Design a protein with these regions (language model features):
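Cysteine-centered iron-sulfur cluster-binding motifs in ferredoxin-type domains/subunits
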Residues: 56-63, 306, 360-362, 366-368
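Radical SAM enzyme core and accessory elements
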Residues: 1-12, 21, 315, 355-415
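A short, conserved structural fragment
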Residues: 17-28
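Radical SAM enzyme [4Fe-4S]-AdoMet core and its adjacent flexible, acidic
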Residues: 173, 177-306, 328
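C-terminal accessory region of radical SAM enzymes
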Residues: 257-293, 322-370
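Short glycine-enriched, charge-decorated loop/helix-capping segments at active-site entrances
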Residues: 79-83, 177-185, 380
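Conserved alpha-helical substructure of the radical SAM core
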Residues: 29-155, 159-162
């Protein structure tokens, strides 16, 4: 009765109404409904899987100009040298059950992180972390620069460290200029060799290319190199391009030329998306929606940092976001004394969703995007997050829809 003047047939009008394209709600009612859904989705996510990581040490053997952990050096070299003790490893595993008592809700893959987790001098404590974790039913992956991998080849195996993310920043010359070993200097050749050895061990290797305007063309070079080496034909190898964000006025980043998200995706579009690029999982969700004919997966948060995940550091503190580790105002809590003590920051992180952001709650992409990365949003330790960080999701979504059409419709994979 509300849509008697509809230009569509009764059947089409009913379908549009059932899907929410037509509504009998006014603007305020729609916004209230979105906020209600945002809270429901957030509560759902907080009750689901928790992910955990060990920040083995803040120390790193590389000196990269764009590293977000550069500010950690302000605490002095000695501060970053501390490595996990066996006692703290035990307490971290105990803390995981305090954070989420239902072990079946634990992500069974624990991430090893840093700094650089797989420094050769960290081998003893890595062995202890792996041994304790395996006895408790966990497996591992690692985010590593890949330089010291030869010291870990025997534990790069199914059941222990099963996957690696390794950064390669373009051709040899450019990579060596950006990702410099603090003693040996050049690192490209050794990393490429180590990637090959890791692949031979049967584990997954994801090569990440931190991409700006200066090295975008190097994606083609790397693609050819990995084909020539036989890496690309292996099912356990992937390479993807990740947008490098930063300020071009930063004097520490003179070797870099940052670009925005729209420019980044426009460049990939010109290359007909020959290389995988960062799209926050949007393409996979669209393809899954079409294939399964189920509703698109909606979220009111950007990632697990807002739903209770924890990154344990060697000082007895834990964080929720990889990009805020070492920044004391983002400490979520403390676990080092055998009990969990949450900080005020935990409320800011774990209670933030799109409903508390005027911009995000009014955006039609809000429940698809989840509100953008909080690590890049305005933040105050007392009041929490202010203006949200928009990652140009509308253009990301439009590109993903077109890619899904090309893959599923043109190739008739949806049938």
């Amino acid at each position: 009765e509300e849509f008697v003047d509809s230009p569509f047939s009764a059947e089409t009008t009913k379908m549009l109404y059932s899907r929410g394209y037509l509504t009998d709600k006014n603007i305020d009612e729609e916004l209230n409904y979105v906020q209600h859904l945002a809270h429901l989705f957030h509560q759902r996510d907080k009750k689901l899987f928790k992910s955990f990581a060990f920040l083995v040490a803040y120390n790193c053997n590389f000196r990269c100009p764009y590293c977000f952990e550069t500010n950690i050096s302000q605490d002095g070299r000695h501060w970053s040298k501390r490595v996990f003790s066996k006692e703290l490893v035990d307490k971290a595993y105990e803390a995981m059950l305090l954070i989420e008592p239902q072990k079946e809700l634990h992500n069974k893959i624990i991430t090893l992180y840093g700094g650089e987790p797989l420094l050769k001098e960290n081998r003893e404590i890595i062995d202890y972390i792996l041994k304790r974790g395996k006895s408790l039913g966990y497996k591992f992956d690692a985010i590593t620069n890949g330089y010291d991998l030869q010291a870990y080849m025997d534990v790069l195996t199914p059941g222990l460290i099963e996957a690696l993310q390794i950064t390669v920043d373009g051709c040899k010359e450019r990579h060596d200029e950006r990702r410099t070993h603090y003693v040996m200097g050049k690192s490209f050749d050794k990393i490429i060799e180590n990637i090959g050895m890791a692949l031979q061990r049967g584990i997954k290797v994801m090569v990440r290319v931190n991409t700006d305007a200066n090295n975008f063309a190097d994606l083609h070079y790397l693609g050819q190199l990995f084909e020539q080496l036989g890496y690309s034909s292996l099912p356990n190898f992937k390479m993807y391009s990740a947008l490098l964000r930063g300020d071009n006025n930063d004097v520490t980043s003179q070797k870099l030329k940052y670009i925005g998200a729209k420019k980044f995706h426009d460049l990939h579009k010109k290359e007909k998306f020959r290389y995988n690029c960062q799209d926050y999982g949007t393409l996979n969700k669209i393809e899954a929606t079409i294939r399964t004919k189920k509703i698109f997966e909606l979220h009111s948060i950007y990632c697990g940092a807002q739903s209770g995940s924890a990154i344990f550091d060697p000082y007895g503190d834990f964080y929720s976001c990889y990009q805020t580790v070492g920044d004391k105002k983002h400490i979520i809590g403390h676990y080092g004394k055998g009990i969990l003590k949450y900080s005020d920051a935990s409320k800011h992180w774990y209670e933030h969703n799109i409903s508390v952001s005027h911009k995000c709650s009014h955006c039609k992409y809000g429940l698809l995007c989840g509100g953008g990365c909080l690590a890049k949003a305005d933040y105050n330790i007392e009041s929490g997050f202010g203006k949200s960080f928009c990652n140009d999701y509308p253009s990301v979504f439009a590109i993903a829809v077109n890619k899904a059409y090309d893959v599923l419709v043109t190739n008739k994979q949806f049938l």
